[in-house]
Swiss-Prot record:
The keyword Cytoplasm applies. InterPro entries: QueA, QueA_dom1, QueA_dom2, QueA_sf. This is S-adenosylmethionine:tRNA ribosyltransferase-isomerase. Monomer.
Length: 350
């Protein structure tokens, strides 16, 4: 399948550069995955579309301030490091700039020596393996010295670091935020609970591969990046109970979707406690096994994320919805507006 089938025209001014002042004031496009019907709403209207007995699945990963600026100990040359994946102990897979200056044995110093890293080898796609040394607690030092690794299409400086975290972020380890969750406030989540909507939490640590463009000409040639996920016994039991009682499982974001669909694929359609690495790639033709609805932002043209959404809601429906979003001047990407996709015609509003 040609990746150009997932292209659409997006004016640059529709790429949201900063978050809205209030999280929940974003717009919400409601798309019926079967009929293609569209409604234009605000995010707080999600209360009308979720019903007692439904379950929202939220990714409680927390974004690391994963971008570090340091100097080579021998020459003083500036080096930028982006943490991608913790391998074991203090060893990390990273991207470094300029990569040609960092060879095996190179020592990089951050924060006047508060944190040091030694290059122990190369990694995939031009990356470097670094081993860190420090006194104290690594994540506390990282919190002091690191910067949030905003996506490459965001050019503005983020004034409030917390705006690139969900209000329920808990498990540190992501190089990017699960952005569909950024629209929720604690008050909105409380209102959903009062309505009888269940909240279930999983963890999937988002890697920077989520921003990598598809370089192959056809979908089938593309290989997905792997990301670590975890679902507890408590969450699995809740999801199975919701299913048994006829409720819907609504994932917040493509990361929650990838987690549930990975587990269901690996366990004959069942949801159970599991941890591991997933490189699942969902595109048209994929049959969903776990979810009934999806809340997600508007994604990049020709990205694996728009392919996932097209697998769930039909490519023609999705591209029509995206063209409508452009026409109606919705905000796109990480700090942009949201979609809620499900079989709405069957449910109606309550």
């Amino acid at each position: 399948m040609d990746i150009n089938l997932f292209d659409f025209h997006l004016p640059e001014e529709l790429i949201a550069q900063v978050p809205l002042e209030e999280r929940e004031t974003s717009r919400l496009m409601v798309l019926d995955r079967e009929t293609g019907d569209i409604e234009h709403k605000h995010f707080t209207d999600i209360l009308s579309y979720l019903h007692e007995g439904d379950c929202l699945v939220l990714n409680e990963t927390k974004v690391m301030p994963a971008r570090l600026h340091g100097v080579k100990e021998d020459t003083g040359a500036h080096i930028e490091v982006l943490l991608l994946k913790q391998e074991e102990g203090d060893k990390w897979e990273t991207l470094v700039k300029p990569a040609k200056r960092v060879k095996e044995g190179t020592v990089i110093s951050f924060g006047e020596g508060k944190l040091k890293a030694t290059c122990t080898g190369t990694a995939d796609q031009g990356g470097r393996q670094l081993e860190f040394s420090y006194d104290g607690i690594f994540y506390e030092i990282l919190d002091e010295l690191g910067e949030m690794p905003l996506p490459p299409y965001i050019k503005e400086t983020l004034e409030d670091r917390d705006r690139y975290q969900t209000v329920y972020a808990k498990e540190i380890g992501s190089a990017a935020a699960p952005t569909a969750g950024l629209h929720f406030t604690e008050e909105l989540l409380e209102k959903l609970k009062q309505k009888g909507v269940e909240l279930a939490f999983i963890t999937l640590h988002v890697g920077l591969g989520t921003f990598r463009p598809v370089s192959a000409d056809t979908i089938e040639e593309h290989h997905m990046h792997a990301e670590y996920y975890h679902m507890s016994e408590e969450t699995a039991a809740l999801l199975n109970r919701v299913k048994e009682n006829g409720g819907r499982i609504i994932t917040v974001g493509t990361t929650s979707t990838r987690t549930l669909e990975t587990i269901a694929t690996d366990h004959n359609g069942k949801l159970c406690a599991a941890s591991g690495w997933t490189d699942i790639f969902m595109y048209p033709g994929y049959e969903f096994k776990a979810i009934d609805g999806l809340i997600t932002n508007f994604h990049l043209p020709k990205s694996t994320l728009i392919m996932l959404v097209s697998a769930f809601a039909n490519r023609d429906n999705v591209l029509h919805a995206y063209n409508e979003a452009v026409k109606e001047k919705y905000r796109f990407f990480s700090f942009g507006d949201a979609m809620f996709i499900a079989s709405h015609a069957k449910m109606g509003n309550k």
